[in-house]
C-alpha cells in the first residue's frame, strides 16, 4: 500500500519551473494561503460517517461480545454496518495525521479535529487523502472495504473511534 505524505511531495510547479519564474519554494511558502484551522470541543457535534446501524457500540466499562472472535472484549470504537464500496464521510472538519494499514482495522485514517480530539476511520479502501490534507465535514475519507478477518462475521463495517488526548471517548455522545 502506498501512503502519500503531501509534505514530502516535490513537483516542478512548487519550484516555479512551470511558471518560468526563478522563485524558490521557500519564497512561495511565505506567500501561500494560511493553513486551515480545525476546532472541536465537548459541545461540538459529529455527523454520521456511514449510513448503517451500530452493530457494536462503544464500551470501555464492560466487555461486549465480538462474534467473529467468539470472545468478550472492551470496544474503544463504534462499529457501524455498511455496504462494501459505500462512501465514508468525515464526521467533522479535520487534518489527516495518519494513514496506515493494520490487521484489525485494515486501512485506517486518523483526522485531528482540534483541541486534542481525533477521529479514527477503519475498514477503508481507496482513500483519496494524504497526510496533512484538510478534510471538511462530509468530505470523502475513503470507501468501505470488505471486513478484515477480525470482523468477518459482522460483515462490511466502519470502525469509528473518537479520542481526546489519546483516550477513547464514546462517539455516540457527540453524534447529531
What are the functions of these language-model segments?
Residues 2-3:
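Short, small-residue-biased leader/transition segments that mark boundaries at the very start
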Residues 6-52:
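Intrinsically disordered, low-complexity
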Residues 33-37, 59-89:
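Short glycine/threonine/proline-enriched tight-turn/helix- or strand-capping micro-motif at secondary-structure
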Residues 41, 49-53, 65-66, 73-77, ...:
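Extracytoplasmic
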Residues 50-54, 82, 86-96, 122, ...:
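Generic structural motif
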Residues 90-125:
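Zn2+-dependent peptidoglycan hydrolase active-site motif and core
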Residues 133-176:
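Conserved, short, structured surface segments that act as functional micro-motifs
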